[in-house]
Amino acid sequence: MRARFKFLIAILVVSISINVVIGYYYSDKYTLTQLSDKFTNFQTTDFEPVQIPEIYEEQVLMLSFEKNVFSKQDFTPWKTKLIEKFQNVFEIPDYDDITLMPVEEISEDEYDEYSLNKYSTSAQDGDNIIFYELKPKDNAKTTSCEDTICYSTVLVIPGSGNQGALDAINQPSQFSSYYYHKGIAEELVRSGYVVFVIENRGWGERGLDVQMNCKQPDVYCSGNQLHRHLFNLGYNQYSLQIIDTMQLLKHIHNLDYVNNEKIAIAGLSLGGPVSIAVSNLSPNVSGTIAASGVISQYKTVGSGITPGMLKYFDQPDLAASLSPKPLYLSWGLNEKSEFGYEAKNKYSAELVNNSYKLLDAEEKLVIVIHNEQFNHGHTFEMTSLTDFLDNTIG
């Protein structure tokens, strides 16, 4: 009996010691109020925009659609000033000034319905661009271009994350369990489109070991750390991605089997604003898709990729300037933070719709608010997206 009593005392001492250590750890990090909230409050709250003090808002959105466009006659002069200011703020060159570099084939794979080629080329600043081409084996989306068969083509710009292009082309990787692009490139090539997928700078196969003690698996950490470090060095990763994508699009324009009258650009998340920008700055883009990509940085105090931008314009202004060209925008009701805010409040959707309505082009605009559960709705809604492509470049 005495031995059993001693054993129970020992267990009690160990238990108390462990709880003291845990208590010390949390008391060193949190106040009692924070601890109470941390362990008792499991309710999530809806996203609410941050209220900025008025002293910082005396001169904002000076080139916005709402402040400058009141009639059809206002639209073209406004767009010209807007795009000029956009290029100035983000240091984006003209399409004609983009230099094409030699393209090297890295690998080639054959599947039952399509071929998959991997390429690399030097970027404008010497970085290494990686991209994939998926080409169908049937002629479902082809037309006759002079003396050859040419294809309707889609350029896909993935969202952030080290899932990267492999997510979009549905190839396995160490991040497969984090994929959220629904293998869009594979889905589209099976429908007959030639599909190109660019690897975003700083992510996936273009990621860098930035030695920032990122936890494994490193899905987002290293890319975000690199973005911030480049920003402090005077580089904007968003700008660099736009320039990379313009270069790839120019390469696509020079392929004899691509129908330059039937090219669409599709972006998810980060890829959304990139697709909007590239479509505004480049010729021969017949349709633009931005899924969970266009948000009001002004209303939601967004991602921080836009230094100085809100003095002049916001993301939905850039989307509105695409009118009357075919445009597809989507958001998910189950998305978190600013994306869910846009889905529920429709701020950007209504602003862009007003632009298309002004130019009598509402039939060219598709706005989808979906109820996807996958990845909390931060993904492509494939049915409406493929319908849009079939109706514009299919």
Predicted regions and their residues:
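N-terminal Sec-pathway targeting helices
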Residues: M1-S15, N19-I22
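Primarily recognizes the serine-hydrolase "nucleophile elbow" in alpha/beta-hydrolase
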Residues: L240-I243, Q247-K311, L318
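The feature captures the conserved acid-bearing segment of alpha/beta-hydrolase catalytic domains
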Residues: Y298-D360
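C-terminal catalytic histidine-bearing segment of alpha/beta-hydrolase fold enzymes
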Residues: Y356-G394
